[in-house]
Every structure is written in C-alpha cells, then in structure tokens.
C-alpha cells in the first residue's frame, strides 16, 4: 500500500537490499538475440485479460440503469479508452469504478489509461534462458532494466523489453540466467491521490 501511495515499485537487488524505484529507464549494455546468447525462448501473447473498450464510471451508478447496454453508463462515465489491437478482434467492454480521490483530482483518465496499458503489458511475456549472468559490460542482469531483444522467429525483431524477473543457475549443464521480460507498460504504477492532496480538502 505504501509503495502504491508513493507511486513506487519494489524489488530485491543482487546484494540483498530492497530497492524502491519507478519503472526503469536504465538500459543494459547488451541484450538477448537469436543465434547469439539465447539457449531457450518462449513467448506468450494472451488476449484473455484485455478488452476493446475501457469505461471509467463514478460510484453513483444504479443497477436499474442496466436496461440499455449501450447508454446505461453515459451519465456517470468519467473517462474512456480503446485498445486498438483488441478492438480488431471483437467488441469487449470493461467497466471500471474510479476511486473517489481520483475523480476529485481529475485523474480518472489517467486511471483508465493505466488499466488498459497495464493489461497490454502483462499480456506479452517473454521467457528466455541465456548463457551468461552478465551483460557485455560485466554487470549482473537486474530487474527493472531495459534490454534490446531480437528474436525474429518469435516475431520480436529489434524491440526493447523490461526485465521483470531474473533467476541465476549454475549446475552440471553450466551457467545460465533465466529472464522474464515484458513491455514497460506492465509495470506502470496505479494512479492514486490522497484526500489531503485535493484542493480545498482542508478548508
């Protein structure tokens, strides 16, 4: 809860310390590429948790309003967003109740954009096993780091993804690192506003 209120992510560093930070903008000295350092790769693109349209509404919606699916929420709609990729497949709407603090601070659109972008990011997950614990600069792979990815076979040519998780292994088969990678949008922090931050709250 504290990290959400502060708009922070948290994860372990290689030395065991806990780091509180924002979504990473730091780039590794090298990345992963087909035919170079990748031993195994698996890419999952899952549309089951994505929607064509997102509608943010206030709490004052009445169940009686459900008689008209197309217009029932018009009077309480605060923000909308459309996922163009999901919209090409089918119409699928998601209704989101916007928190009162976000309504009062005019952040409803931000909240709906976050809902859509996070679902987009989490729907695209790449898992790779590579032959080294470190990038070309000798630095250990770390979560929240952007790396270049080039895997044409999986339709991921020359893209950039964020490291979500790292597992280092050393056994009879050698030294390996397993990386879980996603688009940075998967880790954007959910908007939040304290009541005390709202104009006129303490007056």
Q: Which residue stretches match the model-derived regions?
A:
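Acidic, small/polar-enriched beta strand-loop surface segments
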Residues: 4, 9-120, 127, 135-172, ...
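Intrinsic-disorder/low-complexity, polar/charged segments enriched in Ser/Thr/Lys/Arg/Asp/Glu/Gln
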Residues: 125-127, 176-178
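A generic structural motif
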Residues: 17-19, 177-181
